[in-house]
Curated annotation (Swiss-Prot):
SUPFAM superfamilies named among the record's database cross-references: Phosphoenolpyruvate/pyruvate domain
Protein source organism: Xylella fastidiosa (strain 9a5c)
Catalytic reactions of this protein: 3-methyl-2-oxobutanoate + (6R)-5,10-methylene-5,6,7,8-tetrahydrofolate + H2O = 2-dehydropantoate + (6S)-5,6,7,8-tetrahydrofolate
Protein's UniProt keywords contain tRNA-binding: no
Single GO MF descriptor: magnesium ion binding
Name the UniProt record assigns to this protein: 3-methyl-2-oxobutanoate hydroxymethyltransferase
Main location: cytoplasm
Cofactor(s), names only, from the UniProt record: Mg(2+)
Length: 272
């Protein structure tokens, strides 16, 4: 497995090249310019301004209260700290309820620096993906455990277990790519299933709690640094600052572990 090093800003073609080369893609969240600079300088390829900010920054119990205004503010902050990494941004809860509404929400995010929009779920969201892609907006499709669906799921639970559920998730992944998604994010999915999906599709997959078979990995920065968000710590989280050191060192250690395949290991992985 090659280790991808990129001295140029990340782009959609660079993502496709990484998939072809078998080079692991490193992704982390950021919510302000200071941390964004650290990520950008220490091996992170994609920076995600996630609606997870609702839980780790604002102190909510879920991502549901996060607004488009919140996302625009934090995206603008992060964009000021990013030079090389690609900036991916969540559409918050119900901002993608229709194609037109999604475009309305995505536009101010793109104006302040977003380079790709992340959308949770499948089903009617396929129409949203197509609508945005037709308007030259790159889209990341977030499948598996989608935190905006926490009320329907009844909590934060592993998705895709069992033959029927696994088959449905594989079909959703293929449909998202057919709709035009440039990137897939798979959350809390059995590692075997995530590896199958990664083989199924032509675009890169980024895993969080989805095993080492994905094309890349993402974590919430606060989790990587062992910061207490007031919520139970998921199995897939590893504290890269547990033994001391600096934030920059922890980010570099994470990036290296993703690229050499040592993270995630079995301890941080779900099975069928």
């Amino acid at each position: 497995m090659s280790i991808y090093t990129n001295s140029k800003p990340w782009t959609v073609p660079a993502l496709a090249e990484a998939k072809r080369n078998g080079s692991k893609i490193v992704m982390l969240t950021a919510y302000d310019a200071g941390f964004a600079r650290i990520l950008d300088a220490n091996g992170v390829d994609l920076v995600l301004v996630g609606d997870s900010l609702g839980m780790v920054v604002q102190g909510h119990d879920s991502t549901l209260p996060v607004s488009v205004h919140d996302m625009v503010y934090h995206t603008a902050c992060v964009a000021r700290g990013v030079r090389q990494a690609m900036l991916v941004v969540d559409l918050p809860f119900q901002a993608d309820a229709s194609p037109e509404r999604a475009l309305e929400a995505a536009t101010p995010l793109l104006r302040v620096g977003a380079q790709m929009i992340k959308i949770e779920g499948a089903g009617h969201k396929l129409e949203v993906i197509s609508y945005l892609v037709e308007r030259e907006i790159p889209v990341c499709s977030h499948l598996g455990l989608t935190p905006q669906s926490v009320l329907r799921f009844g909590g934060y639970k592993v998705q895709g277990r069992g033959e029927e559920a696994g088959g449905r998730l594989r079909a959703e992944a293929r449909a998202a790519v057919e709709a035009g998604a440039t990137l897939l994010l798979l959350e809390c999915v059995p590692s075997q299933l995530a590896a199958q999906i990664t083989t199924d599709v032509s675009v890169p997959t980024i895993g969080i709690g989805a095993g080492a078979g994905c094309d890349g990995q993402v974590l919430v920065l606060h989790d990587l640094l062992g910061l207490d968000s007031g919520h139970p710590r998921p199995k897939f989280v590893k504290d890269f600052l547990a033994h001391g050191g600096s934030v920059a060192g922890a980010v570099r250690a994470y990036a290296n572990a993703v690229r050499d395949g040592s993270f995630p290991d079995v301890e941080h992985t779900y099975t069928s």
